[in-house]
């Protein structure tokens, strides 16, 4: 389904990874600098950043001062002009960000700390639009996205609830879902960016079965021959035989039964209570868990992947990735937000982006 290794006949067999810069006023530019400062990455892929030279140059200056990272920015207007050399960050420069456009921010001051803005929303949306276009034209083998602000893109007139929905719309994909992963702990979502009330209404047999299929296929793509899939219930104690809700009986179990008839490996043959399914997954019993709504999957992943330092008031670790399943192109993302409050200080943690690039490489080489 994915279209990988399409330009790899000119230069070598390393996949070209298009990385969006994210919101120019967020943490995307600086974690991109830190990720691409690992020169070993260039032994496995050819990265190109989709964004604006102005923000990337500032982030490079900060990285040099704070972390002693010395990288050059190479603006290009075509993928074919990229150098793909360690120490040089190729930026597909859309030229959307002019620092002087920001009210009260002189040219010499950092272009950060603005928070959600029309300018940041418009720019970050256009980066995503461009990288999707490049992937659909097979000019890049995979896409990796830094964070944008949902509020900011909507302020700019782009009415989407997140990257996943943008990708689905622009690739004309009807059936898709979000998968989160932290190392070997993985979850696939039946619903994501909707209210909890609506999320309950979306737990239907057809949708649950659809996500089971996508989860099963995703695990096979990364080399797991017979994936073991856990299915989280929706209600406390999986509804206790209908006492606390009937979704397990009426929707989830019928989906599981059909999946079992198709030969999909669901060890229990039934939904597992949400308060125990993740402990079993962390113990290695499942390769992936199908969850019923956003926070049911996000909370356990972030409890494992995020480590907060209360003394220093920053994140010591921000690990985990977001993958959109069901698309005709590869899309992997960081699993955190824009970090407006600390953006530009050079302290943002790049682990999630590094993980995302690694996973994109793995999918590209499939």
At which residue positions do the language-model features occur?
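Active-site glycine-rich loop that binds ribose-phosphate moieties when present
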Residues: 165-174, 196-220
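Well-ordered beta-strand positions
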Residues: 180-181, 322-324
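Flexible loop/hinge segments that line or gate small-molecule binding clefts
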Residues: 158-186, 192-195
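Substrate-binding rim/cap in mid-to-C-terminal beta-strand-loop elements of soluble/periplasmic
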Residues: 190, 325
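Contiguous, glycine/small-aliphatic-enriched amphipathic segments in soluble metabolic enzymes
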Residues: 2-163, 208-230, 234-322, 328-366
